[in-house]
C-alpha cells in the first residue's frame, strides 16, 4: 500500500484528528512536522488556498499529486479508497447524526480550544512559546524564538474574532465547555465512543480538539482533569486505536442512542445552531458582523463565510436522506435545538 504524505503541526487539532483516524484505519503514512508551506513549495506543488493543517497529498484527476486540505471531505475520500475499518455508519440516519457531530466537533468544540489557547494569558504564553519551536524546520536562537513568539501570539490573538471569543463571550464559552464536558463524561460511563462500541468520524473530530484541551492548554487541561476523568482517559485511548478489533464491534441503533448523546446535541443546539443561522443570514445580507442572544447573553462576532458553507453542507446531507430517514432524524433531534438548522 502506498504511503500517504501528510504535513501538519503537533498543536493542530485537525492534524491530530487525521493522524488518529489514519492509525485506526491502518493506512500507512509519512508525517512531516512544521513549515508546511515551505515543504510544499520545495516539492513544486501548488499551495492550497488557504493553507490549512493538515495537508495531505492525494492524486488528482490527472494522476498527479495535489496538496489537499479540509478533513471532512478527506475522510470521505479515505473511506472510499480504504473501506476496511469504516468510520461512517451504514445506516443513513445514523450517518447523518455522525456528520452533524463531526461538524460540531470541527466547528464548535474548536471555539472552546481557540478561546482558551489565545484568550487566557497563561495559555497564550505557553502556545506562543511552543508553536515556533515545533513549526520551524531549524533550531532557533533565543532572539529568533522571542521574535517568532511575539509574532505568532499577536497574529492569533487578533484572530479571536473568528471563533467569537471576547471578554463579553468568555463566560458563555467557559460554561458551555463545562456543560459539554459533563455530558460527554456521562456518556463515557455507558459506552466507549459517541455512537457505540467503536469510533466514527465524529469521535476523531472530537478527539482532535479535545486532545489540545486535555493535554496542551493549561486552563482547560485543569478543568478536564477536575471534571471529566473519563474524557481524559478517552483522549489517551483515541490516540492510537490501530489494535481495536473493530470488525466485531457495533454502532448503536439511532433509537437506542444514549441520553447523554442527546444532552451533548442539546448543548450544541443551544449554543452553536443559533450562531450558524445568524452567521448565514449575515453572509446573505452582506453584513460584516452580527449579534444574537444565546442563553440570556449577547454573542457578537464578525461574519465568517466558511461556516455558512458548513450550514449548507449539513442541509445538503439532510436533504439527501429518504423521507423515512429524515423523519428518523427529526424525531431523534426533536427539542434539542439542532432541528432548527435542518
Residue ranges and their predicted role:
Residues 1-143, 194, 214-215, 267-342:
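GST-like domain detector, emphasizing the conserved glutathione-binding G-site
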Residues 14, 18, 173-180, 184-187, ...:
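Alpha-helical packing segments of well-folded alpha/beta enzyme cores
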Residues 70, 172, 176, 230:
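Soluble or luminal CAZymes and related metallo-dependent hydrolases
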Residues 106, 181-185, 239:
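Structural signal for well-ordered, non-membrane alpha-helices
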Residues 123-174:
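Divalent-metal (Mg2+/Mn2+/Ca2+)-assisted nucleotide/phosphate chemistry catalytic cores
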Residues 160-196:
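Short N-terminal edge-element motif at the start of the domain
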Residues 194-214:
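GST superfamily/GST-like fold recognition
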Residues 207-298:
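Active-site/pore-lining binding-face segments in mid-to-C-terminal subdomains
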Amino acid at each position: 500500500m502506498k504511503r500517504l504524505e501528510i504535513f501538519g503541526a503537533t498543536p493542530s487539532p485537525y492534524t491530530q484528528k487525521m493522524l488518529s483516524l489514519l492509525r485506526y484505519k491502518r493506512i500507512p503514512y509519512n508525517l512531516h512536522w512544521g513549515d508546511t508551506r515551505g515543504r510544499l513549495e520545495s516539492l513544486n506543488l501548488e499551495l492550497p488556498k488557504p493553507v490549512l493543517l493538515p495537508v495531505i497529498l492525494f492524486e488528482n484527476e490527472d494522476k498527479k499529486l495535489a496538496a489537499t486540505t479540509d478533513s471532512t471531505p478527506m475522510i470521505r475520500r479515505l473511506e472510499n479508497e480504504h473501506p476496511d475499518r469504516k468510520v461512517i455508519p451504514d445506516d443513513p440516519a445514523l450517518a447523518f447524526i455522525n456528520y452533524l457531530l463531526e461538524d460540531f466537533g470541527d466547528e464548535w468544540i474548536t471555539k472552546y480550544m481557540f478561546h482558551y489557547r489565545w484568550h487566557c494569558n497563561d495559555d497564550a504564553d505557553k502556545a506562543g512559546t511552543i508553536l515556533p519551536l515545533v513549526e520551524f524546520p531549524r533550531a532557533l536562537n533565543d532572539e529568533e524564538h522571542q521574535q517568532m513568539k511575539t509574532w505568532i501570539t499577536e497574529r492569533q490573538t487578533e484572530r479571536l474574532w473568528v471563533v467569537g471569543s471576547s471578554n463579553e463571550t468568555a463566560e458563555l464559552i467557559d460554561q458551555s465547555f463545562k456543560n459539554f464536558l459533563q455530558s460527554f463524561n456521562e456518556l463515557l460511563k455507558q459506552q466507549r465512543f459517541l455512537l457505540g462500541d467503536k469510533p466514527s468520524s465524529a469521535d476523531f473530530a472530537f478527539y482532535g480538539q479535545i486532545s489540545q484541551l486535555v493535554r496542551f492548554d493549561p486552563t482547560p487541561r485543569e478543568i478536564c482533569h477536575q471534571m471529566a476523568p473519563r474524557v481524559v482517559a478517552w483522549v489517551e485511548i483515541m490516540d492510537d486505536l490501530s489494535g481495536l478489533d473493530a470488525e466485531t464491534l457495533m454502532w448503536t441503533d439511532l433509537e437506542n442512542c444514549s441520553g447523554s448523546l442527546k444532552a451533548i446535541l442539546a448543548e450544541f443546539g443551544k449554543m452553536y445552531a443559533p450562531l450558524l443561522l445568524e452567521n448565514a443570514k449575515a453572509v446573505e445580507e452582506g453584513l460584516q458582523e452580527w449579534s444574537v442572544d444565546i442563553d440570556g447573553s449577547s454573542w457578537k462576532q464578525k461574519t465568517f463565510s466558511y461556516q455558512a458553507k458548513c450550514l449548507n453542507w449539513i442541509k445538503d446531507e439532510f436533504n439527501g436522506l429518504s423521507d423515512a430517514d429524515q423523519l428518523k432524524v427529526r424525531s431523534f433531534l426533536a427539542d434539542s435545538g439542532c432541528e432548527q438548522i435542518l
